[in-house]
């Protein structure tokens, strides 16, 4: 997901997005552990999406606190 798409969301939607991404990442890790994951690059992409969403969430929370 692009940063511009994430910036358009509010804090509650971003928190839900992070939860969804963490669940997806967990599922991918389990598939990798059981040798069912064909595209291992999806792990990296999901991890980066999580980091991107958490960064924008922190920016929004910090901006709201000021």
Curated annotation (Swiss-Prot):
Return the similarity comment.
Belongs to the universal ribosomal protein uL29 family.
Q: By its UniProt entry, which Pfam families does this protein fall under?
A: Ribosomal_L29 (PF00831)
Gene assigned in the entry:
rpmC
Q: What is this protein's name?
A: Large ribosomal subunit protein uL29
* HAMAP family, A to Z: Ribosomal_uL29 (MF_00374)
Highest taxon of the lineage: Bacteria
The UniProt record lists the keyword Membrane: no
A Gene Ontology molecular function term of the record: structural constituent of ribosome
Q: Which InterPro entries match?
A: Ribosomal_uL29 (IPR001854), Ribosomal_uL29_CS (IPR018254), Ribosomal_uL29_sf (IPR036049)
User: Would the keyword Ribosomal protein be found if you checked this record's keyword annotation?
Assistant: yes
The UniProt keyword set, sorted, is: Ribonucleoprotein, Ribosomal protein
Which SUPFAM superfamilies does this one have? Ribosomal protein L29 (L29p)
Q: Which residues form a coiled coil?
A: none
GO aspect biological process, one term:
translation
- From which source organism is this entry? Methylibium petroleiphilum (strain ATCC BAA-1232 / LMG 22953 / PM1)
**Annotated TM spans:** none
> Which GO CC annotations does the UniProt entry carry?
ribonucleoprotein complex; ribosome
């Amino acid at each position: 997901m692009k940063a511009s798409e994430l910036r358009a969301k509010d804090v509650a939607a971003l928190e839900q997005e992070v939860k969804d991404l963490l669940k997806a990442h967990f599922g991918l890790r389990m598939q990798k552990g059981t040798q069912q994951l064909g595209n291992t690059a999806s792990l990296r992409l999901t991890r980066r999406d999580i980091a991107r969403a958490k960064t924008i969430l922190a920016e929004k929370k910090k901006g709201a606190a000021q």
